[in-house]
Amino acid sequence: MDSDPVSDYLKYENEPEYLDLEELPDSDEPVYILGKQYDTKTDKCDLQSDIVSRLWFTYRKKFSPIGGTGPSSDTGWGCMLRCGQMMLAQALVCQHLGRDWRWEKHKNHPEEYQQILQCFLDRKDCCYSIHQMAQMGVGEGKSIGEWFGPNTVAQVLKKLALFDEWNSLAVYVSMDNTVVVEDIKTMCKYQPQSCSMAQAASHQSTWSRCRDTSGHCSGWRPLLLVVPLRLGINHINPVYVDAFKACFKMPQSLGALGGKPNHAYYFIGFSGDEIIYLDPHTTQTFVDTEEAGTVQDQTYHCQKGPNSMKVLNLDPSVALGFFCKDENDFNNWCEVIEKEILKHQSLRMFELTPKHPPHWPPFIPPTKPEVTTTGAELIESTDKLFDVEEEFEILSV
């Protein structure tokens, strides 16, 4: 199809065209996208639909200044924050819409889809906005406008999720390359209630059985599991490659955060030795809700062929993401990880242990401190938030 490059660019800024996957040629190698397998010779339309349906968060400009006097664009520094938003958004899509949900332009979508989008708008009163993430990053030692690594973004999402009552996600970020099954089940089976910092300091947090909106005990909060890893010193150790790629085959896969130094991507799959990613390095204008309360969603879906890079060119600092909707889903994840991914490694990518290591400090599930606002509104200072648990966390990889 003949096209004018200038007009194509203008269309992309305002209303992207649905493009062919010319960048992904026919191959005997299957393509895996977040737990789904495709044949490029026969499944290109389905593959295209799957990739386009992922929520795509990029640099934005002309939003209200962060903190009132800070930057009004995240161009140049917010790429890892945007990748973290994409991973979390995929978890929320799986939770509310299901992995098989597909986006179509100009089609009415479920109300939950709009609710998910509104969690990530570039406004200070949206739970996972660039404003909230940047300001929560201050508590992780990152100045507003400073580049984040994958582990720092994971820690920020874990803390912001405590203010997100609609999704009620349990966010677990592994430490010391170890995933502790017992700790995850403790966190997912109980829902924290707001407590004072004095109570948290004395480990007297108030907990109650997780309940759904009807008041019945649901028994399990949906789990966002993030595993920060360093898969080498300066480059990825080839011994980890097969296990890393195998994680994208799992039905619980949320992909991975990573990329190159100061240049983050959201990895969603692979084909052969090529790893496929969504790229946040496009600056688009801030989008707000319309009068009807809906969000114009065209610019939140990447309607062009996917990007890819050689897996060995990936920076070794990454964070794998997984979503487990219920306890059976998590048990299945544990079984596959142990028997099919970690067991066959000469050097294990990370450890999965059933019990809390006795030499570790006691596991204290995170609770939301008392704040003067509701939800995630106006988290202006994080100096005193969560300082109790910080001593137990590894905050850099």
Swiss-Prot record:
Q: Which GO terms describe its cellular component?
A: cytoplasm
Q: Which UniProt keywords apply?
A: Autophagy, Cytoplasm, Hydrolase, Lipid metabolism, Protease, Protein transport, Thiol protease, Transport, Ubl conjugation pathway
* The organism's place on the tree of life at top rank: Eukaryota
* EC nos: 3.4.22.-
Show where the record puts the motif LIR.
392-395
Which GO MF term does the entry hold, naming one? cysteine-type peptidase activity
- Keyword Protease attached: yes
Keyword Cytoplasm attached: yes
Q: What is its main location?
A: cytoplasm
For the biological process aspect of GO, one term held by this record is: aggrephagy
**Catalytic activity from the UniProt record:** [protein]-C-terminal L-amino acid-glycyl-phosphatidylethanolamide + H2O = [protein]-C-terminal L-amino acid-glycine + a 1,2-diacyl-sn-glycero-3-phosphoethanolamine
Tell me the PANTHER family matching this sequence.
CYSTEINE PROTEASE ATG4 (PTHR22624), CYSTEINE PROTEASE ATG4A (PTHR22624:SF35)
Q: What does this protein do?
A: Cysteine protease that plays a key role in autophagy by mediating both proteolytic activation and delipidation of ATG8 family proteins. The protease activity is required for proteolytic activation of ATG8 family proteins: cleaves the C-terminal amino acid of ATG8 proteins to reveal a C-terminal glycine. Exposure of the glycine at the C-terminus is essential for ATG8 proteins conjugation to phosphatidylethanolamine (PE) and insertion to membranes, which is necessary for autophagy.
Q: What is known of its domains?
A: The LIR motif (LC3-interacting region) is required for the interaction with the ATG8 family proteins. Required for proteolytic activation and delipidation of ATG8 proteins.
- Its recorded name reads Cysteine protease ATG4A
Name the encoding gene, please.
Answer: atg4a
